[in-house]
Amino acid sequence: MKTILILVGKTTDKHFLAGISDYAERIGHYIPFEITTIPELKNTKSLSEEQQKTMEGELILKQLQPSDTLVLLDEHGKELRSIELAKWLEQKQQTARRLVFVIGGPYGFSEAVYSRANDQLSLSRLTFSHQMVRLVFTEQIYRACTIIKGEPYHHE
């Protein structure tokens, strides 16, 4: 199973970028993993939030294959503890050919993307910057991989 993380917009902070790259490399020792970045929309001042979500949604959907399992990182998604995420990921590894996570743009996802999604996860009830979510999520995927393998990274 291949795991893909789709990001809307570049990671601009060099400290976050370094951490994300480090965790992505670590994840790659456990599972095939890649990060795909969809460029941010340009000249959006004249667009409504809905128009922006629709345009970003079209770009997200173009990245998908029909058989992909699509998981949105969304404030309304299920909250899981790290152990639960590991069990969830292990189950998905056995059933999905490509597991695709998406961290959306500043206004969230279009209805078309929500309709296509197989699942939604939330990292917290707290609000994080999109840059921070990328780092926290890659760390959690790495943590889940170490839990699945029974390695000592995670402590209860």
What are the language-model segments listed below?
Residues 1-27:
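N-terminal beta1-alpha1 ligand-phosphate binding loop
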Residues 6-8, 36-38, 102:
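Short hydrophobic segments within beta-strands
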Residues 11, 75-78, 105-108:
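Short glycine-rich anion-binding loops that position phosphate/pyrophosphate groups of nucleotides
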Residues 17-20, 82-86, 114, 134:
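Conserved strand-to-helix beginnings and helix N-cap segments that scaffold or border functional pockets
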Residues 111-155:
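Structured adenosyl-cofactor binding patch, chiefly the S-adenosyl-L-methionine
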